[in-house]
From Swiss-Prot:
Protein purpose: ATPase required for the post-translational delivery of tail-anchored (TA) proteins to the endoplasmic reticulum. Recognizes and selectively binds the transmembrane domain of TA proteins in the cytosol. This complex then targets to the endoplasmic reticulum by membrane-bound receptors GET1 and GET2, where the tail-anchored protein is released for insertion. This process is regulated by ATP binding and hydrolysis. ATP binding drives the homodimer towards the closed dimer state, facilitating recognition of newly synthesized TA membrane proteins. ATP hydrolysis is required for insertion.
Pfam families reported in the protein's UniProt record: ArsA_ATPase
EC number: 3.6.-.-
Entry keywords, A to Z: ATP-binding, Cytoplasm, Endoplasmic reticulum, Golgi apparatus, Hydrolase, Metal-binding, Nucleotide-binding, Transport, Zinc
UniProt-listed InterPro entries: Anion-transp_ATPase-like_dom (IPR025723), ATPase_ArsA/GET3 (IPR016300), ATPase_ArsA/GET3_euk (IPR027542), P-loop_NTPase (IPR027417)
The protein's name in its UniProt record: ATPase GET3
Assembly and interaction partners: Homodimer. Component of the Golgi to ER traffic (GET) complex, which is composed of GET1, GET2 and GET3. Within the complex, GET1 and GET2 form a heterotetramer which is stabilized by phosphatidylinositol binding and which binds to the GET3 homodimer. Interacts with the chloride channel protein GEF1.
GO cellular component: GET complex; Golgi apparatus
Entry annotation: catalytic residues: D57
Classification via NCBIfam families: GET3_arsA_TRC40
Lineage: Eukaryota, Fungi, Dikarya, Ascomycota, Saccharomycotina
GO MF terms, alphabetically ordered: ATP binding; ATP hydrolysis activity; metal ion binding
Residues annotated for Zn(2+) binding in this entry: C281, C284
């Protein structure tokens, strides 16, 4: 390349058009800290706009990161009035789905109802599907263009703190999968309806279900268009400087590219920067040597990506104040000679 991209997320933070930012990677690499830091910086840099951070990871950590309890409904972050958080609960969504299915009719022998109950209880990846349907609600109500109706919520950007790689890839594959599945289901609906009636299924319940499926299909098509538009959606990969994490990051990037999703930023967490320690321990020096080896490989492999290097901290990053201090290194490269005091002097929560 003729130029080197800035090793920061400053361009992403300042971009005006982004509506959806996904943050993902291998388990234990600091996804929640990174997604929370991105959300905090967005809120700080754009105080006049509203932002929403959503956790789609069944093992929710947003409440721990902000030292504040969040649930399935968006709640304002204390200390940042223009940032809200929520944690999607697949079990609660499953319960709501089953209750909605029961509303169609109360006949326990209805084969359609029995089929729906079996499906919701046994489909592989149902957690991701239910999480996706919850996300659909917010995307449907998100104002994307100025011509959108005024009753839509005008979040400037929604940030997703995703589950570990495998769950996330299944989650992101759902728009395409559902689009194909619903299309085939619609083709069968003309034949399926009379067949269900012959088996004793309620006609009104079937009509309601097919109407609901048509609505879902339209929403899924809209999401597919937005998720593959680089002006509206991007994915930030998070990793640590080790072989397994690097390998999984490359696998994820290849998958994301196959989904036609934009990805041009990688955050590398937990770096020691031992070269600048006055009295480094032998273990730290050895580990930093290993980290530098994989950093060099990343620099060569991802020369056309924003490669952001984040330091290992002396304590956990919890609470808004600590997130503000840590997140500044997403937009300004960390300098161990100048910034070491910032990362070793975090407030205990």
């Amino acid at each position: 390349m003729d130029f080197e991209l800035e090793p920061t997320l400053e361009e992403l933070i300042k971009q005006d058009t982004l509506k959806w930012i996904f943050v993902g990677g291998k388990g234990g690499v600091g996804k929640t800290t990174t997604s929370s830091s991105i959300a905090v910086q967005l809120a700080l840099q754009h105080p006049e706009d509203e932002f929403l951070l959503i956790s789609t990871d069944p093992a929710h950590n947003l409440s721990d990161a902000f030292c504040q309890k969040f649930g399935k409904d968006a709640r304002k972050v204390e200390g940042l009035s223009n940032l809200s958080c929520m944690e999607i609960d697949p079990e609660a969504a499953m319960s709501d789905l089953q209750q909605q299915a029961q509303q169609y009719n109360n006949d326990p022998n209805d084969p359609l109802k029995s089929m729906m109950n079996d499906m919701t209880g046994s489909i592989p990846g149902i957690d991701e599907a239910l999480s996706f349907m919850e996300v659909l609600k917010h995307i449907k109500n998100q104002k994307v263009t100025e011509s959108d109706t005024k009753d839509k919520v005008s979040y400037r950007t929604i940030i997703f703190d995703t589950a570990p790689t495998g769950h996330t890839l299944r989650f992101l594959q759902l728009p395409t999968t559902l689009q194909k599945l619903l299309g085939k289901f619609q083709q069968l609906s003309g034949k399926l309806g009379p067949m269900m009636s012959m088996l004793g299924g309620g006609a009104q319940g079937q009509q309601d279900m097919f109407a609901k499926l048509n609505e879902v299909q339209k929403n899924v098509e809209e999401v597919n268009e937005q998720f593959t538009n680089p002006d509206l959606t991007t994915f930030v990969c998070v990793c640590i400087s080790e072989f397994l994490s690097l390998y999984e990051t490359e696998r994820m990037i290849q998958e994301l590219m196959s989904y036609k999703m934009d990805v041009n930023s990688i955050v590398v967490n937990q770096l020691l920067f031992a070269d600048d320690d006055e009295n480094p321990c032998k273990r730290c020096v050895a580990r930093w040597k290993m980290q530098k080896k994989y950093l060099d490989q990343m620099a060569e492999l991802y020369e056309d990506y924003h490669l952001v290097k984040m330091p290992l901290l002396g304590s956990e990053i919890r609470g808004v104040d600590n997130l503000k201090r840590f997140s500044q290194f997403l937009i300004k490269p960390y300098d161990p000679k100048v910034d070491r005091a910032i990362i070793t002097d975090l407030k205990e929560q």
